[in-house]
Every structure is written in structure tokens, then in C-alpha cells.
């Protein structure tokens, strides 16, 4: 089966989700069609056709012009290749895939990932463009796939046809995201979480400029690591995490490590407390090293500008490594968290987050190991790439008949 994998732009890292299924389904003949790609991971050995490489130029006028010119070229390239199925990731920038499917009569599968499913998100030209692409994808897709039940409900509210919409959890490779080979070192005993009154605002007790930019693993194995992996943005809640961690650091010593980049990176580097370490973007192997080193991974994604977290694959990656997670109860996040083993925080405030992190750091080594094993087992059984691939294979076979 020839499958055209289409996406507006392809950046790997970090967007491994766009190619994970293709790499796990070698029985299909894959070709990626995109406006522009930047793939620095040599393991992503897929043929890629770029319709407008200059789209990644930082100059906005050049980027916009080449994007417009590249849409038709991308559509024609997909049609000329003659695929059996076209699979578009994200409704935004789906016009070439929709057009190619229409003119060639090929079935179109569209995976919705987040903001592309919302009926009204922002204003201006960007919002109008998103709406145009979303309508085209909803009308032209043979099957619409949402990465969580939450996002499927968002899509239904935006006008998606329920008869063509289903949930397809992306899954993570549990043969790659695995616990550390060596046993986790024992730690000093920490008391149970303290009970203390909540302040009006959690203070950040640090002078500006203390955030350390360092990607190396810590030598002090006894100091527990609280880890964040993702975009350093308000949507991902990294500001809440730093505030919560700072309030806890004196009474519950730990190191907060932030892996990634984003709009809040500069501010965090300038003002983060001394126990916070920023690594910047890292290769996937280095991310896994940090995940395995962590005692708990925290993803406090919160509603921002009308949208919420659709899934949160980093939660699955961490739990596949046997590391429990702490997350805000928002959007599709609860669907990615092992029931009874990881922690969901209903109150989305730095104070509530601090209490949840405190609870996680108080777990004994035995309890941590038990929770980690439960996390690993749940992800392997319910959210593995293996299961996701099996479902996708069935979908392809159904639409290609």
C-alpha cells in the first residue's frame, strides 16, 4: 500500500509523532509530502518531498510568499505519486492534501492534534486560515482521527461528522521508552507531605539570573529531579511549575530541570531560582536519559487563549520509562495518565501543583517502584505505539477498499 504522509512543515525533532507510525509500518510504501522539512535525526529514513523549502526562512514576507506558491506544487506532487491513501497530520495546512484527494479520488485520513480542531481560536488572518483549512479537512476527509476523546468532542463542536470521526491515540514506542537498565539509586528519607495553609500567592524566593543553562546529568544522584519536557510556554504551565517548585525547594530539596525551548525561555533564564536548570532542546536520546533520571515528570498544561492540551505524549513517554507523572486535570491529559499510579491536580494553581509535587517526592522507594511499574504496564497495554499502529492499519485497509 502506498501512503502519502502530508503535513504543512516537518521538523524532527521535535515532532516525532508525525513519522512514528510510518517508521513502525515498513510494509507500506511511504513518502512524506510537505512544504518544507528540517530532519536532523538520521533514524528518520523516509523519502521526503519538499514543495517550498524556503517556507522555513525566518523572513515573514518570503515565508508567506513561498507558502502560497508551494500549496499547489505540493498538491500536484501528491497526486502525481499515485498513493492508495493520503494521511494528513493536522487540519491546518491541509488544503494540498484535500485537493489531491479530491482530484485523484484517493481516500483521505486526517489526524487532528489540537488547535486545528477548534471552531474559534484567535482572530485575524491566522484564525481565518485555520478555519478555512479545518472546514476543508472536515468536508474532504474520508476519516477524521482525534488524538484524544477530549479533542474528538472539540471537533464535534466544530462541525465534524460523527460518522467519520474516531479516537486514535498516537501511542509511544514502549520498546524504546523503557526504564533505566540500572536500578534507581536509593535516596535519603523524606517525611510525608506537610500540611500548611495556602498563601495568597506562592512566592519565588530567588534573585534574578540564577537559572542554570546546563544539559549535563547531575552528579548528585541523591537529589531528586523534578522534570519538565516540552515547550516553555504559558499553555504548558511552565510558569506555574517554576513557582510551585520554588515554594517547595527549601523544605523539600530537589532540582527542577526544564528540557525544551519556547517563548518563556529568556525570562526563565533571567529569573529562575538557583535550583532550576534549563537544558534547551535536546536530542531524543538525551531526553530519555533525563526522563530515566527523574523522580517525577510534571506537565501542568492549562487552558490558554481558548484551548487546552489535547493529549501530551511526554506523559506517556515518562510512564513507559517507569516514571510517574504529575499533571493538571485539563483537556485530554487525564486520558494519558495511569489511574491510581500518577497524580492529576484538579485545582490548576501553583499552590495545588506544589502540594502534588510534594506528595510525589514523599513516596518511599518501594512505593515509587510500585507506581512506576503500574505506569509502565498501563502504557504498554493501553497507549503503546504497537496498538496504535494496529488500529491505523485497520483504518487504512477500510478506507482503501
Show the residue positions of the predicted features.
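Conserved acidic donor-binding segment of nucleotide-sugar-dependent glycosyltransferases
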Residues: 339-351, 359-365
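Carbohydrate-associated surface elements
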Residues: 150, 171
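Nucleotide-activated donor-binding/catalytic signature segment of Leloir-type glycosyltransferases, i.e.
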Residues: 266-288, 296
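N-terminal subdomain of nucleotide-sugar transferases
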Residues: 1-47, 246
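Acidic donor-binding loop of glycosyltransferase active sites
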Residues: 292-307, 323
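Nucleotide-sugar donor phosphate/pyrophosphate-binding loop at the beta->alpha transition
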Residues: 67-70, 107-109, 117-137
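Conserved donor-binding/catalytic core segment of Leloir-type glycosyltransferases
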Residues: 4, 145, 185-201, 205-209, ...
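Short His-centered aromatic/hydrophobic patch
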Residues: 88-93, 112
